[in-house]
Amino acid sequence: MNFEMPVETESNKETMEYLIKNSVNGMTYIQRFYRCVTNSSQIILVKTSREIQAKCQDDSKPYKLVPVGPLVQKPQDHDDDEKIMQWLRKREPSSVAFVSFGSEYFLSEEEMKEIADGLELSNVDFIWVVRFHGGSKVTSILEALPQGFLERTNGRGLIVDWAPQAKILQHSSTGGFVSHCGWSSTLEAMVYGVPIIAIPMQLDQPINAKLVVDMGVGMEMPRKNKELAKEEVASVIRRVVIEEGKEMRKTAKELSKRLKKEEDEEFDEAMKKLVQLVHESRINQVAASKET
């Protein structure tokens, strides 16, 4: 297979090392991946869109990558949504930065401090989902954040331990998404037309972040020796949400329209290919049984 990496980086090497060294049930992740691929019938269904991954689809011979669409779930209503959504409805259009790093990565104490200080310096309204690792010594939001942060950002910041991500991204007050660039989160932002402020942490996230930048729907946070700096955090958030936000949101909204337009078509095409594959498999089985 010839899956072309977008760019040769230290992050890509780290991703490969992770896949090679880590295992489940005695089989490494890279072994599981290749086993799935070699057992496939020349077709690999991918949670993506032609609009996003056209180059990768062209370079994957002899296997054909078939996009099934972003498969982004529609926002669900939950009882504890209302406080957050009520706060969001009071904000100006495209004025809020939504900050969330998914459910599998937990910020270090240093990262937490730089992001908090950066949000404070930016003067941009924000919703920040703050989570702690189960084994962490930190047990409360007050312990995790810089002293006085909540008081200094009172009125323009909302700190929560969970948030209805899809509903927030879909809301007109949301102007930017500070994200780790996990694939599902990246697709959600693209489908809802929200520019991404990328802070990739591990695995495929650096590759996803580069894709976001190349497509003109976000910016990656500059880091020196992988370390965040509050000044850069503030600067990039302001650029995406305020200073360059209008043009970037226009590009993101245009991409969103194209993705939604193609979504049903891509899914239907994928189902047709699966039906065809099953049909061909049955024909081959019948032919093989006649030969024996």
Region roles according to the model:
Residues M1-K167, S172, G176, M190-Y192, ...:
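Nucleotide-sugar-dependent glycosyltransferase catalytic domains
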Residues G182:
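Aromatic "clamp/platform" in nucleotide-sugar-dependent glycosyltransferases that forms part
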Residues S179:
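A short, small-residue-rich loop immediately preceding and capping a beta-strand
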